[in-house]
Amino acid sequence: MIFTGTANTRLAVDVVNHLDMSLGKMTVGRYSDGEVMVEINENVRGKDVFVLQPTCAPTNDNLMEIMVMVDALRRASAGRITAAIPYFGYARQDRRPRSARVAISAKVVANMLQVAGVDRVLTMDLHADQIQGFFDIPVDNIYAGPILLGDIWRRNFSNLVVVSPDIGGVVRARALAKQLEADLAIIDKRRPRANVSEVMNIIGEVDGRTCIIMDDMVDTAGTLCKAAQALKDRGAGAVYAYCTHPVLSGGAIERIETSSLDELVVTDTIPLSEQAQACGKIRQLSCAALLGETILRISNAESVSSLFAD
């Protein structure tokens, strides 16, 4: 059984349509002061239940929704509850810098999910793989790579080079470059403060080539747009960005529209705003089939990793 909240109903509908089933019957509402109210409207006793809900903006509202949904299902005696969170909010707060008195919010969210009654977590392209270790329950972190890679292959680009937007993304970019039999370039940047970045140097040859920037998410798009400009300044013929999660906060849309990017390709882990849908440089791919197949395999106790075998 698959239930969903209000964060990304369209994706949930696409997933159940792929599986030729219907969404679970549940009412999600708000009291006058904004508190979340959830009621399960069918029998779930002993059932294998999935709650599909990304914790995108409004992050705290959507996070609280999933907590209350899970609690309602647990109290209704669901047999097993899997939190399917395609976009895992708070994932960027995954460690404590040496001199900062800050929370490790990704761990806080992991604790909350487990206390609420989640038995298993399914997510896509976690910002930091080590977040899986914050849980004492199984976590399936699947990858949008097959979706993005398939789109690149269909477009039959020539003279490709895969670009990592920072040192931390090298592993992801290298894996894509290997599958495409393409070269790899790296953008060396320094980030003076949160959501502000400065492109410093490009490691690799991009002159006259088609550049594919690969990243797990695009937020304010500051890094992405500066990277595209730096690549064009170094002679790149075209710059395309492939990012799993379209957070697109702040002035991201305006930056993308006026940037040197030729196109930004994202998935539907997060629904696009009307402004983003109207942007001619943004194109969205569906991850419903991949999520649906993963949910089916988890429910049937089949291998998930074989979906991503080279």
Swiss-Prot record:
- Top-level taxon of the source organism: Bacteria
Q: What is its main location?
A: cytoplasm
Instruction: List positions binding ATP.
Output: D33, G34, E35, R92, Q93
Reaction catalyzed: D-ribose 5-phosphate + ATP = 5-phospho-alpha-D-ribose 1-diphosphate + AMP + H(+)
- PROSITE patterns under this entry? PRPP_SYNTHASE (PS00114)
Keyword annotations for this protein, in alphabetical order, are:
ATP-binding, Cytoplasm, Kinase, Magnesium, Metal-binding, Nucleotide biosynthesis, Nucleotide-binding, Transferase
Annotated active site: K189
Q: Name one GO molecular function term.
A: magnesium ion binding
Q: Where does Mg(2+) 1 bind?
A: H127
What the entry lists under Gene3D superfamilies is as follows: 3.40.50.2020
Record's subunit section:
Homohexamer.
**NCBIfam families registered for this protein in UniProt:** PRK01259.1 (NF002320), ribP_PPkin (TIGR01251)
Provide the family line: Belongs to the ribose-phosphate pyrophosphokinase family. Class I subfamily.
HAMAP family associated with the record: RibP_PPkinase_B
Protein name (database record) = Ribose-phosphate pyrophosphokinase
